[in-house]
C-alpha cells in the first residue's frame, strides 16, 4: 500500500504543477512551484507544499489566497486526469524549507567573508 501512495503522490505532484502552469490563470499563483506532496494513507487528503520566488510576506499571502481560490479547479482537473475512486481533498501549505535553506546559505556566505577578511 505504501508503494501505491508514493506513486499517487508523484502523479498528483506532476499534474498539479501542470495544471498551475496551463490552466490556472490567476496572477497570484504565478511563480508558485510545488515542492512536495503528502498524501494520507487512505488517499482522502493531500497536503501540497509550495514555494514562491518572492520573499515578501504579502506575496506569500496572495499566493495562498490564489491557490485556495483555484482549489476547486485543480481538484476537478485532477479528477479528469487521474483514475482514482475519489479525488483527495487538497490543502496548500507554504514550504518553509526553501527559505530556511536560503538563510543557511547566507550565513555560510557571511562566515566565508569574515574568514577571508582575517
Swiss-Prot record:
Subcellular location, record wording: Cytoplasm
UniProt xrefs under Pfam families: RBFA (PF02033)
GO BP annotations, alphabetical order: maturation of SSU-rRNA
Gene Ontology terms: cellular component: cytosol
UniProt key word Cell cycle: no
Molecular-function GO terms, alphabetical: ribosomal small subunit binding
Domain of life of the organism encoding this protein: Bacteria
Keyword entries, A-Z: Cytoplasm, Ribosome biogenesis
Biological function: One of several proteins that assist in the late maturation steps of the functional core of the 30S ribosomal subunit. Associates with free 30S ribosomal subunits (but not with 30S subunits that are part of 70S ribosomes or polysomes). Required for efficient processing of 16S rRNA. May interact with the 5'-terminal helix region of 16S rRNA.
UniProt record similarity statement: Belongs to the RbfA family.
Subunit structure: Monomer. Binds 30S ribosomal subunits, but not 50S ribosomal subunits or 70S ribosomes.
Protein name, per record: Ribosome-binding factor A
The organism of origin for this protein: Latilactobacillus sakei subsp. sakei (strain 23K) (Lactobacillus sakei subsp. sakei)
UniProt lineage: Bacteria, Bacillati, Bacillota, Bacilli, Lactobacillales
Gene name tied to this protein: rbfA
